[in-house]
Amino acid sequence: IDQWTAFPGLYGYLQIRGGIRNMWMTDNMYVEKAMIHHKWIGGKIGGKFPVNLSYEFHHVAQWGGFSPVYGDLGNNWNAFLNALFVRSGGSMATDQINAQGNHIGSQILTLDIKGNKWKVSAYWQNISEDGPIKFIGFGMNTPDGLWGINITQQHWPFISGLTYEFVQTTDQSGPFHDKDGFVFGGNDSYYTNSIYQNGWNYWYRTIGTPF
């Protein structure tokens, strides 16, 4: 369900959307024949009111493929289920301790205000590289994220909209990774991975927000 769809019986005041995609990466730059899993779900309240509030959660994972160092990274049904449910698995120690594959969670909180021939959208996006994932604003890396505002209008023909965004990635849940063995996180080094060293790019083009 790519578009916001009214929840039955609530007259459009509650809308939902979500889906699941599974893709293959064909560039074969470092890990050959790696795969991408993406699922998302979201809800919006407000409907015909001038103010709407929406929340979305996205989970994306790189998994499978063949590494020049580690060989087969798991390309069977069980490996897919590990990626789908963020479970540990595989033959490598990092995948046994954490989760099989390279996982990212993203949360998006959006406030929409609509008027006569104009609309203002203010949004906040937060990324999670480590678990446990908490609601946006309560995680270990709350200072990091993308904040934006988008204004569209139909009054004047010479401009249709204006967007401003601010990105911060310096907190990274603190400088140390798993310093006590109980609180997992820190030194997130977003978009990098020791196994999938080509990172989140496809044919040398960044997937997602560039830094």
Task: Spell out what each predicted region is.
Residues 18-24, 53-59, 122-126, 162-168:
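Transmembrane beta-barrel strands of outer-membrane/channel proteins
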Residues 28-36, 66-70, 132-137, 174-179:
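Outer-membrane beta-barrel translocator domains and adjoining extracellular loop/strand segments
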Residues 7, 21-29, 62, 127-133, ...:
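Sequence/structural signature of outer-membrane beta-barrel proteins
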Residues 4-17, 45-54, 113-119, 153-159:
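Short loop/turn motifs that connect adjacent beta-strands in outer-membrane beta-barrel proteins
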Residues 16-24, 86-92, 125-129, 209-210:
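Flexible, solvent-exposed coil segments and beta strand-coil junctions
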